[in-house]
Amino acid sequence: MAQAIDLAQLEMMTAGDAELAVEALGIFRQSADMWSRLLDPQADPAQWADAAHGIKGAARSIGAMALGDACEAAETLGRKGTPTRVEAGVAISAVKDELGQALEALAHVEHQLLMRRSFQGVRLDPA
């Protein structure tokens, strides 16, 4: 199973600056909180497609690639016309599942970065 956050991507996007990474993770958390409220399969597909688009960019910027991919699939579905409620529900569920995993990994990574003040030794798996 792929990791929820690609640490190499996060490190590259922040030029190895642990403080910047912590800031980026916080911004992601705030963005995800705002956009995730609009992920409602009962709503207009354009609304949840926009939300998925917003989460997608933020996710990929911190290395949450599986979340970005789930968002891309939901966004594409929402922009294709009128998906069924089942299709919408499945796509949005996938986004929410990946978002939950990313937020859990984010908390773990953020804690380690704050404690270590560097990327050295930061891991996603409990050790």
Which positions does each model-derived feature cover?
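Short, well-ordered alpha-helical segments
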Residues: 47-51, 59-80
